[in-house]
Amino acid sequence: MPASTLNDLLEAGVTGRTVLIRSDLNVPLDGDTVTDDGRIRASLPAIRDLAEAGARVIVMAHLGRPKGEPDPAYSLRPVAARMAELLGADVALAADVTGDDARAQAAALQDGQVLLLENVRFDARETSKDDAERAALAGEMAALAGEDGAYVGDAFGAVHRKHASVFDVAAQLPAYQGPLVAAELEVLTRLTESPEQPYVVVLGGSKVSDKLAVIDNLLDKADTLLIGGGMLFTFLKAQGHEVGASLLEEDQLDTVRAYLRRSEAGAARIVLPTDIVMASGFAADAEHEVLAADALTSGAHGASAMGLDIGPETARAFAEQIRGAQTVFWNGPMGVFEFPAFAEGTRAVARALTEASAAGGLSVVGGGDSAAAVRTLGFADDAFGHISTGGGASLEYLEGKELPGVTALAGEGRA
């Protein structure tokens, strides 16, 4: 059954009602400063719509991975401050999740006001494997909303987690799908069910083990898989090439060889780099040179060299493939983009995605490090067809997995 939506809730009327909304506010911090507020901005439309409609809004979110207890390093205080700036209204911050302060502030909320609960992961029950423990916390969360309350799930970046604030609370209140989740699912459905051809997938990041299931699934759906990032070296090694001191997952070699055989037998074409930027070590100022992919240990640093980016020839070839696509999905940087000397491969891929989008294709940046990379490198969000707020959730959807935070909202909401 299709999920009821935020619009359904707004049409039913929310004035005077308390609405819990699970948002994705898991943003990077430098001390007390939010360094990338993309997820906060993406969460604001639903929060603003509820507040302007007269709801008493209680926002739930996590930040980082605290160990199930309060930790000042993971407090949502900087997030509340930035949210208030962007919202142009006060955002109160509770000192706890469902404790005395949260209950008192929730009870004192007036129509149109916004309260942010402290990091939900400060309560160990949020991520518990024990269903009863999570349900107990969800019951306390639901109690903050009262008898006429409602729940909106709008944290796409967390929907692959079976956590109390994402999954269990939806069973204890009338539950509605937020616009961010709806928009993400619409795009991902296009990628999995009806992608326009040619369909090119760009995969990077450090570990091939993180991408095994998505490669397995996309080999039968995409036309071309472009492989970069640290994961490429396991592919090169599987082909018999030496990779020096580059990142290598030897326990995945047999799996990768099987993928290469499937590709050769008619599945999606796997395209590997033909040249690599090899460095003397993992450092921004490391000496580096461009070497052919089949001669990575032939340079000045021999077998001690490590690959930190795809080479210029590969960057041009990947960009050409991307520009010629009607559908592009990208997850994972091509190199260590945080170091300027090793950012050019990622920059070339990002630029090509913007060009594919400008030409009328669908370009999707799959969240996580890829989203951080495009912003770090100065690209505007609206230059891409879609930037996902959930890297892990996007991948699990493309793997064909069920997302608990989505299925929890699929029951019929009631106003």
Curated annotation (Swiss-Prot):
It is found in: Cytoplasm. Its EC number is 2.7.2.3. Substrate binds at D24, L25, N26, R39, H62, L63, G64, R65, R121, R161. It catalyses: (2R)-3-phosphoglycerate + ATP = (2R)-3-phospho-glyceroyl phosphate + ADP. Pathway: Carbohydrate degradation; glycolysis; pyruvate from D-glyceraldehyde 3-phosphate: step 2/5. One of its GO terms (molecular function) is ATP binding. GO terms for cellular component: cytosol. Keywords: ATP-binding, Cytoplasm, Glycolysis, Kinase, Nucleotide-binding, Transferase. ATP binds at K211, G307, E338, G367, G368, D369, S370. Monomer. Belongs to the phosphoglycerate kinase family. This is Phosphoglycerate kinase. It comes from Micrococcus luteus (strain ATCC 4698 / DSM 20030 / JCM 1464 / CCM 169 / CCUG 5858 / IAM 1056 / NBRC 3333 / NCIMB 9278 / NCTC 2665 / VKM Ac-2230). The lineage of its organism: Bacteria, Bacillati, Actinomycetota, Actinomycetes, Micrococcales.
